[in-house]
Amino acid sequence: MAFPTVEVLTELVTPVVAQHNMDLEGIRINKAGKKSLVAVSVDSDFRPDLDQLELVSNQISEVFDAGEAAGELSFGAGYTLEVGTPGLDQPLASARRWRRNRHRLVALEVEGKKSVERIGALNDDETAVIVVKRRGKKLVVRSVQLAENTQAVVEIEFAKPAEDELALTALEFDQALDRGEENK
């Protein structure tokens, strides 16, 4: 029996992840004889902590072990199971990831124009997000469409964010747009 495919593992892992109100972001397989790796990436609207990831990892391991014992799966000589969340260096590819990173700085590229701005609220249908940028002493608030031509990666920030920036990113979408119009 061959090493299980990503599709087969996805069918087995998705229900386990869903029990914990998480979403399966992806599965990566690196086959390397005795050192094969199955890396499972999960995410949710809340930030899963290490205890939650350990619980999910243990349950996925139990499902894989049961599949091997029943002869339905074969991981060969052995494998390492790794369960984690997408790293900060991963692009913000879903509305959930934008929502989860609210108040953080983001390196943003929209239609070829690059900038660093702070993430605010999403609109109701999750097709646009508020971003805030400081220009001198002034804060500029704008809406950015979450489209395929929008590239964004969270920036690591060592300094404490300015209170006025956080106040704007804490506002609801329409409130932030109104505040942006007032500041023009």
UniProtKB/Swiss-Prot annotation:
Belongs to the RimP family. The keyword ATP-binding does not apply. Keywords: Cytoplasm, Ribosome biogenesis. PANTHER family: RIBOSOME MATURATION FACTOR RIMP. One of its GO terms (biological process) is ribosomal small subunit assembly. One of its GO terms (cellular component) is cytosol. The gene is rimP. NCBIfam families: PRK00092.2-2. Pfam families: RimP_N. It comes from the Bacteria. Its main location: cytoplasm. This is Ribosome maturation factor RimP. The keyword Cytoplasm applies. It is found in: Cytoplasm. Required for maturation of 30S ribosomal subunits.
